Amino acid sequence: MRLALPLTLAFALGALSSHAKDPALGATTFTVYEAFLSPAQEPGEESETPKLLQKSLGATAPSTPREQRKSRGHGVLRFSKDLTRAYVEVEMTGVNPDDILMFHIHCGPPGVLGPVVVDFGELGNLSKTLANGRWSMELTNANLTFIKDIKGMKSGLPESCPAELGFLAQTRTLASLESLARKGVLYFNLHTKAHTYYGEMRGQLYAAQP
């Protein structure tokens, strides 16, 4: 009877594959995260923009309370298993493309404003690329943003995302970005003329459901 447990364990271990996989699968298989964007996920109203930032990051068009906005969106972020590429696909409704100012991936838990790690505005005119409400792109390590200064804000803030929350090292690779996604601390944020500081709508990224 004493041999039963060791034998069972040995059989279980023997059943596991000990063979390495084809390395090419790293570029063709993916870890997928998704977000449904809505104004309700923004942590504040435009009227609550801090006074010190109203000139640089305040609205330049009349704002609407979150519960009255019609903007909605869905975004997918796919990481190749070898973490050399990531792919973003976004679809939005209820937003005038001409009103779009910025679109980012930030890091931060739900209800918290966090620094920018991917600035989609650096990759083309957002009003044009989102004109039909759909947009997709490929990301590499080179697309990760290290923002040292924003006009009107203290020099050095914000500086990308931490490789680990509460840790000083910054995110510089897709591997670090995927690690943050796994923890549920990445979010899409769309900024418009009417909703600039907090944003028009936001979507926290979580592992995609089958």
Language-model segments: which ranges?
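Fungal secretory targeting signals
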Residues: 1-17
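N-terminal leader/targeting pre-sequences
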Residues: 18-210
